[in-house]
């Protein structure tokens, strides 16, 4: 929603308007919060800003009206607190990729002041997934999964959680790159610290990618940990932008049925440079007939210089090569017809 009023469209509606109508755009809601804080004796300033992770910060050396959004700044002695007043979910002080790492124009009693907004690091955007996959003797499976998400990643799952079940399933498959389930049930969600934990269950008539006789070739997890497609041969002159830095961790536990055993497993690996980190560990418990894969993927920064483009392309190519390895399990009591 955008309600235009005043020169340049930046004059907010009065507090009374928001209070009575229970809605407002970024200007009106920011002004409403500013006045609430004022009553509590807390000083704050509206801040004009240009939004979107692909839009570059306002240039202090070249005056130009590039602003299309308003947020609120609460100045403090050591650091400022920034509020995105249009969000009912963002953690206080977290801006995210929409307005982070920009130059905001504070509207103070002494005039306009251009100040930088904070930049998130990969610890601010976490995705931690744990999945138990119970295989049956026919190659099907039931998966019980929980996701803990913070920052921008939490914002994505929060919006998806508002949709109906069919739409959620479609988004999980086509956007989050989950293997398409035959049944999908989103369970309860719960606020956990600064993030949210989401619980869901999935059922598959066929969890394996393909089979050869009594050998099943399984994916390492029910979704792709990385879907970055970066052309390593491309010559780049400008910076390469990711939406945000992140830390992804995944623990997937395969529970094998009786008379099943592991035939081949992916190799452990660790990759590290100043841009990314990737590590994979495998634990086999023969007594419990389980195979656990623990994986971590960090993107340490979201703005990649042109000089580092080949480095990040090669890093993600190596990650994908490792992610494409299959788990091979063997059915020891019968041969499975080849598909």
Residues covered by each model-derived region:
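A sensor for short, sequence-defined functional sites
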Residues: 1-339
């Amino acid at each position: 929603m955008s309600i235009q009023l005043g020169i340049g469209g930046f004059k907010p509606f009065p507090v009374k308007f928001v209070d009575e109508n229970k809605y407002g755009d970024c200007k009106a809601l920011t002004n409403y919060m500013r006045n609430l804080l004022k009553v509590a004796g807390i000083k704050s300033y509206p801040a004009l800003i240009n939004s979107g992770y692909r839009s570059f910060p306002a240039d202090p050396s070249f005056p130009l009206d590039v602003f299309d959004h308003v947020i609120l700044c609460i100045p403090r002695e050591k650091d400022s607190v920034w509020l995105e007043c249009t969000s009912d979910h963002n953690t206080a002080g977290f801006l995210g990729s929409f307005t982070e790492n920009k130059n905001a124009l504070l509207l103070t009693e002494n005039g306009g002041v251009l100040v930088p907004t904070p930049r998130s690091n990969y610890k601010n955007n976490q995705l931690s997934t744990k999945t138990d996959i119970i295989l049956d003797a026919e190659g099907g499976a039931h998966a019980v999964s929980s996701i803990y998400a913070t920052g921008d990643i939490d914002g994505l799952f929060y919006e998806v959680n508002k949709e109906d079940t069919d739409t959620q399933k479609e988004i999980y498959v086509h956007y989050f790159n989950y293997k398409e389930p035959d049944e999908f049930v989103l369970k309860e969600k719960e606020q956990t610290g600064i993030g949210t934990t989401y619980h869901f269950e999935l059922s598959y008539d066929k969890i394996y990618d393909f089979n050869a006789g009594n050998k099943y070739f399984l994916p390492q997890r029910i979704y792709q940990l990385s879907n970055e497609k970066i052309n390593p041969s491309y010559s780049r002159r400008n910076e390469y932008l990711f939406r945000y830095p992140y830390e992804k961790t995944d623990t997937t536990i395969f529970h094998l049925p009786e008379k099943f055993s592991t035939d081949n497993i992916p190799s452990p690996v660790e990759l590290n440079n100043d841009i990314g980190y990737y590590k994979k560990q495998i634990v086999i418990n023969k007594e419990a007939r389980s195979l656990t894969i623990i994986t971590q993927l960090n993107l340490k920064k979201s703005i990649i210089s042109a000089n580092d483009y080949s480095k990040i392309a090669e890093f993600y190519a190596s990650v994908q090569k490792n992610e494409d390895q299959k788990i091979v399990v063997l059915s020891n009591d019968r041969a499975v017809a080849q598909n």
